[in-house]
Structure formats: C-alpha cells, structure tokens
Amino acid sequence: MAKGRGTSGRARAVRATPARLLAVDITRQCRLRDAYVRELVNTRRKTSELSHEEFDYAQVLSFGVVMCRGTLDEFIDRNLNSPHDIKPEVRDCLRVSAYELLFLKKPSHAVVDQGVELVRASSPKASGLANAVLHKMAADAEGFPWGDASTSIRAFARSYGIPKWLARLLVRQYGREKAAAMLAADLLPAPTFLRDNPYQSGERFASDLSAQHVASLVPLAGTVLEIGAGRGTKTALMQARALEELGHPTIIHTVDIHEFKARLLSERMEQMGIAGVTTHVGDATNLDAIAGLPRAFDAVFIDAPCSGTGTLRRHPEIRWRIDPRDIESLTQIQARMLQSAASYVRAGGTLVYATCSVLDSEDDALVRAFLDTPAGAQFTLAERFASVPAEGGPDGHFAVVLRK
C-alpha cells in the first residue's frame, strides 16, 4: 500500500478508497496515452481484485471525469490562485473529487477527506494545498452551475458537463426542455441491448436498439454495399436478418478507410459464423479508386463518420474532443460520400444514409442539400428515422431511405 507522511513525520497508510485510487489511475492513463476510457476500464476489470461494487464505482468516476472534463477543470480553476501552476498529477485527483461534488452530490466532508488522501498518494507535498482547495471547492459547489440554467446557456452547459457551443446548438435545434432531457440521459450509464445471432445457437451480440432499427432499413434481397462498416456490428445485424428473412446470408461488400478495422470485421464475422461478406479498404469519398469493388449494387448503405453526438454516454471522450470545425469538416466528408455512392446504386435501388449524430447539419440539412444536387435529384425520400438519447432507452441515431 502506498505510504504518506503524517504531521508527526511517521509513515501512515493512505486512506483513499481503492475505487477512487483506481479512477485516478485510469483517468491519468487517459490523459497520458490519449486512450479511450472504456477500453481501459474493460481491461482493468479483467484483472481487478476490487469487489464488483467498488469497481463499478471506479467506472462511474472514470467515465464521469472524462465526460465532464472541461466543466470540472473550470470548477477547479475557479478555486485556485494560479491554475497553471498545479501539477497534472494533482489535477487528476481533484477532477475525481470535483465530479463527486458537482454531479454525484456526495457529502462534501467525505469528498474533501478522500480528495486530500488521493493527492497525498500521488503528490504528498501537495496535500496541504489540496486540503485548502478542496474546502473552497466544497463551498463553491453549493452554487453550481453558477447561474440560471433556464436563461444562461453557460450555466445550462455546465449543468450537463458539455461545451457551451454544443449546448447552444442543441438548445437552438431542440428547445431547452428537450435538450435538457437528452443531456440528462447522456450523464447516465448506457443501457445494454442484445440481438440473437441466428448463425450460432444461443449466442447474442450487443447493439443499441436504434442502431438495430437503422440496419433493418437496408433491403437485403440483392447485393449490398456497406460504407463505413467499422468493426461490423451493422454488418452482423444485416446478415442476421438475412438468415431469418431470406434463409441465407446476403452478399455484402464493405468499405472502410482503415485496414485494421476491415481486418477486425473479417475476424469478427468468422467468429460469429457469418459468411457472405467481402471487405475492401479505401476512401469512400472516391469509390472509383477502390480496386475490385463492383460498380453497381441493389442497396448502398452509408454508415457515415459523424460527430457521435447521439452516443455521448457510450463515448465519454467525444464532448470535449470535438469542436465546430470538426462538424464542418465531417459534413463535407459526408456530402462527398453521398455524391460518390449515388452512382453505385442500380436504377430502382436504395440508398440508405445514417449517422449517430443528433445535429441537423449532419442529418436532415445534409440530406436536403444532397437531394438538390444533380446526383441527388435521381432519388426520392422514402423513409426517415430519428431517435434521441433517453433514460433507459436507445441512443441518438438518424437514417433516411432514398429510392433511385
């Protein structure tokens, strides 16, 4: 066990709880390695000696710190005389305490005590500073979000641990009440939805309920081109439905720009007992440059790269990694994908465009702009689907079905 020094100079056992210590370590690794918190948590769970209850709390803290990082740092900096002078190792500890104070509403005396011990465990000389800062933070937390969230967009953004620019976009698009409900759901653990794998009796795989619906919109009677297939979850969903509805797997060609994802998809299909899938690696904004890719399909499914704003609770890093420039860049890529894919749809065929974004600029507005182009003018809108995050419900997804 790590040791600190008491006021008498004698060695003393650090009293920070194992769950909090683990959360500090996980979020520190996220910072140092630019790693994904979910992957670190899953890896640690396999070897952890913590009880299920302790580990689950460490996961709550780890996800929360990453999700609300910007708001937590603002809170910490409000209570420091010189924010830039604090060591990153100390800030790692204070972020855990800040999340407990602002979003978990834990008793302040317990948070202060544990926060001091967390700092003592990693930076013993800073424990005195931590004690003073944490007491200030505990008092300051009483006024959170430091404004009226019903009128101030800054206070509204703080309430849900998101950047102000994103809060403004969501309120403008959905209204304050609906945006608040979505963002409240995003602070809660994501529910797990399972789908039977008909290729392996008794086996299931995880997929969000809205993602399952999106995959169900793709016609499977003919050949299918799936763009942006990633690790193949929607590929598996389509082939599961093909076996149930057609009695056999359909023919699916997948395209992804990342070779390692194409390799993972192939391995996953083999593990799941799924046949009928051919992978291609290339840039989907220029399908003509992909060697060996057939030139016509009965259905083309674009699972577009997007902001992921419909899946914030599953991907805690998103909210503080993206900015408005990223959205603009993504919409340009999405538009180019639609233009490239349009000519690969046979006459009478179907083009399905989907995102896991809840932003209009990536969804309806982008589709409208495409339909106004010469390539898009060949298509008519046949069906539209949209969901937003809800407590205990599915994530935010968007899809349109276009007929040629």
Residue ranges and their predicted role:
Residues M1-K404:
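S-adenosylmethionine
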